[in-house]
Design a protein with these regions (language model features):
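Short, basic/glycine-rich phosphate-binding loops at helix/coil junctions
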Residues: 3-12, 61-66
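Short, acidic loop-to-helix structural element flanking the phosphoryl-transfer center
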Residues: 9, 13-41, 47-51
Length: 178
């Protein structure tokens, strides 16, 4: 437990700033927002640090939703857990956006929520640079774009079953436009 505590202390003070944005990411995020996409961050970094990281890189304004893992044995420890929480938050946004349409006493039934979730999944794509991103997407029933310019080892994205694999940020745009 001492090692875990040491790691967390170091990460909190230093580690969260040892990331970098890949070239073109800010522009990609800005364009996605301008085009009306709902953008979400699904990271296994501890959620408590996510706002700090987004602010540090000046990209918080590009995300509608940002979800991270939970510390101390929380329910969100794996990528698919994090992605599913993103879906839960999108459903809540969808219900809030449509609240004016229904009577305040009405409730959305389970089949409506399932339909909403299926529609969200059909319109979602996970972009990631590691097998956990790709496998998390598969476990959640959504497509994935594996990016080679990240941290994946050779053939990692292919072996994980990425639906698309791109070499650079521009290729992400091309893939999304297809």
């Amino acid at each position: 437990m001492k090692a875990v505590n040491y790691y967390r202390e170091r990460y909190k003070d230093t580690g969260i700033y040892e990331n970098r944005l890949f070239d073109g990411i800010k522009e990609l995020l800005s364009n996605l927002k301008k085009e009306g996409y709902i953008t979400a961050l699904a990271t296994c970094k501890p959620e408590i640090y996510v706002p700090t990281i987004l602010k540090y890189f000046d990209i918080e304004q590009y995300f509608d939703i940002a979800v991270g893992s939970e510390l101390e044995g929380g329910a969100r420890r794996h990528k698919d857990d994090v992605i599913n929480e993103v879906f839960n938050q999108i459903i809540k946004l969808n219900k809030a956006d449509n609240a004016h349409i229904t009577n305040a006493s009405d409730t959305t039934n389970v089949s409506d929520t399932a339909d909403i979730l299926n529609n969200i999944k059909a319109d979602s794509i996970m972009i990631g640079d590691r097998k956990d991103d790709i496998l998390g997407a598969k476990n959640c029933g959504i497509e994935s774009i594996g990016v080679r310019y990240g941290f994946a080892e050779e053939n990692e994205l292919e072996n994980a079953g990425a639906d698309y694999i791109v070499e650079n940020v521009q290729d992400i745009i091309t893939t999304l436009d297809e």
